[in-house]
């Protein structure tokens, strides 16, 4: 079916038959799904038969929306707000979301990987808004970790075929984790999103050895080797993530003084502006 739409789109005489949803319509459709499908409130007055019918209706709504993604009517990235519910609503819609993840990966592995990391970022930011400090033992945080694990497993064992997609996922995750670099609450502390490295750590076993080296270099450029020598608990996500990237390598985690770390923050901000990687 995807090939059929591609043929239509590539034939000028048939382009009028191809419909692409604009941004406004994409937002309306997504809003409908979030409001009427992914809802936790239950009507206690409903009998069992009504509940089953209601679930069936929701599944049809979700399946129809996912078909629009799979058939390229709306961009793959629109699936991030669906992917993020994979763990929380696994019993109700897990099969539909899993199938959609698989199909989007077949269409474009890299776009699928970007959609995955965006869904993880969305959940992480939501957790940040709800909690001044994220509890790594909380159910919400563990659900994000579990979602990352399931995403990683969905790539299978062929690291060569998935190498570009996985590398892009890591780079996007690193960008988020170190941006902003400045910690308002603690000038010598880590970037406020540094804990996100614990999430993308779940994907490190999908990297080829040579790609681990490239991701490590990218990480060091972004963080500017700015890890203070004291390495408190707040820096542990960076330590753990970096250690998984240097397994089998001779490199050791970089150490710098807190003064050097503060001095380099300004340089890093300028690098973010100039670097398109």
Residue ranges of model-derived segments:
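Long internal repeat-built scaffold domains in very large eukaryotic proteins
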Residues: 1-277
């Amino acid at each position: 079916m995807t090939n059929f739409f591609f043929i239509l789109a590539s034939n000028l005489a048939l382009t009028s038959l191809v419909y692409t949803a604009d941004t406004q319509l994409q937002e309306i459709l997504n809003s409908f799904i979030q409001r009427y499908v992914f809802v936790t409130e239950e009507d206690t007055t409903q009998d069992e038969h009504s509940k089953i019918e209601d679930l069936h209706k929701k599944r049809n709504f979700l399946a129809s929306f996912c078909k629009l993604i799979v058939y390229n009517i709306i961009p793959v990235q629109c699936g991030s707000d669906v992917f993020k519910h994979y763990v929380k609503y696994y019993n109700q819609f897990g099969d539909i979301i899993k199938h959609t993840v698989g199909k989007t990966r077949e269409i474009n592995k890299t776009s699928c990987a970007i959609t995955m990391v965006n869904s993880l970022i969305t959940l992480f930011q939501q957790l940040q808004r709800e909690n001044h400090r994220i509890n790594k033992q909380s159910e919400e945080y563990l659900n994000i970790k579990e979602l990352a694990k399931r995403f990683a497993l969905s790539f299978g064992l062929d690291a060569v075929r998935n190498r570009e997609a996985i590398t892009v996922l890591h780079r996007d995750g690193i960008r988020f984790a170190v941006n902003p670099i400045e910690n308002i609450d603690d000038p010598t502390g880590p970037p406020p999103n540094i804990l996100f490295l614990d999430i993308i750590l779940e994907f490190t076993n999908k990297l080829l050895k040579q790609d681990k080296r490239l991701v490590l270099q990218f990480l060091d450029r972004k963080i500017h080797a700015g890890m203070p020598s004291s390495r408190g608990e707040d820096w542990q996500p960076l330590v753990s993530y970096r250690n998984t990237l240097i397994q089998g390598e001779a490199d050791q985690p970089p150490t710098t003084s807190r003064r050097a770390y503060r001095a380099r923050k300004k340089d890093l901000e300028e690098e973010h502006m100039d670097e398109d990687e």
